[in-house]
C-alpha cells in the first residue's frame, strides 16, 4: 500500500499517463496529495486515483498542450488525437470526501470523472475544449454526495462515447451544483464542434440535482438545460 505521498510542483513532458494511483480493495492507498502539477498527457489521463479512503486531495493542477511548445508538439492533430481517447484528465473512484480544488484542463475527451463510489467537493475549475466536462456517477443513495461550485465548462469538441455535454450525472446519489457556467465556441488549437446537447441516460428518480444555471445531462427525463 502507498501511504502519505505528496507530489508537488512537478511538470510532465511527453508522458502517456502522468500519475497513476489506482489501488485495489485489498491494497489501498491513503493520504495522497497532488498540488501545483502541470503537463499534457498523450492518453488524456493526468491523475488517476482508485481505492484511496483517507481523503485524496488534488489541488492547483494545470493540464494544457501549451506545456509542449518546447518540443513543437502543440499542433491541432496531437490535441485531436488526445480528445479521441475515451479518458478523463482527472479520474477518481472508491474515495472518502475527496477534495478537488483549482483544476484546469484543455483539449481532452473528459475533464473530471467522479466514480460511483466517491463523494466530496469540487470547486474552482475550468474545463476547456472537452467533450464531457464532468461525469458524476452514483453507486447508491447513502453517502454519495458531491458539492460542485465555482466553475466554467467549455464542451465543444467531438470525442467519443457519450456525445458533447458539459455535465453528465448517472446512477444514484445527490449532486449540488452552484455557480457553474457552461458555454461553447470555436478554438484554433483543435477541431471544435457545437451541436445541440441531448438527454440520453434514461429515467431514475433516485438521482437528485440542485442546480443554479447549468446545462446538464441527468439520469432522468429532466431537460438537458436546467436554466
Tell where the protein language model's regions lie, with residue ranges.
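Extracellular/periplasmic carbohydrate-active domains that bind, remodel
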Residues: 1-227
Amino acid at each position: 500500500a502507498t501511504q502519505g505521498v505528496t507530489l508537488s510542483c512537478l511538470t510532465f513532458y511527453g508522458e502517456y499517463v502522468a500519475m497513476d494511483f489506482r489501488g485495489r480493495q485489498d491494497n489501498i492507498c491513503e493520504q495522497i496529495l497532488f498540488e501545483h502539477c502541470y503537463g499534457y498527457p498523450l492518453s488524456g489521463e493526468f491523475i488517476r486515483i482508485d481505492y484511496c479512503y483517507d481523503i485524496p486531495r488534488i489541488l492547483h493542477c494545470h493540464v494544457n498542450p501549451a506545456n509542449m511548445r518546447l518540443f513543437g508538439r502543440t499542433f491541432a492533430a496531437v490535441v485531436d488525437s488526445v480528445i479521441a481517447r475515451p479518458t478523463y484528465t482527472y479520474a477518481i473512484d472508491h474515495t472518502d470526501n475527496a477534495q478537488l480544488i483549482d483544476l484546469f484542463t484543455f483539449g481532452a475527451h473528459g475533464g473530471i470523472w467522479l466514480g460511483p463510489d466517491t463523494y466530496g467537493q469540487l470547486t474552482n475549475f475550468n474545463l476547456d475544449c472537452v467533450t464531457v466536462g464532468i461525469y458524476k456517477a452514483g453507486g447508491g443513495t447513502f453517502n454519495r454526495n458531491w458539492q460542485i461550485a465555482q466553475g466554467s465548462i467549455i464542451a465543444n469538441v467531438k470525442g467519443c462515447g457519450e456525445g458533447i455535454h458539459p455535465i453528465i450525472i448517472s446512477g444514484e446519489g445527490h449532486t449540488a451544483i452552484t455557480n457553474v457556467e457552461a458555454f461553447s465556441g470555436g478554438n484554433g488549437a483543435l477541431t471544435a464542434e457545437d451541436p445541440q446537447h441531448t438527454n440520453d441516460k434514461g429515467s431514475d428518480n433516485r438521482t437528485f440535482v440542485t442546480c443554479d444555471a447549468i446545462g446538464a445531462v441527468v439520469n432522468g427525463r429532466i431537460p438537458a438545460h436546467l436554466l
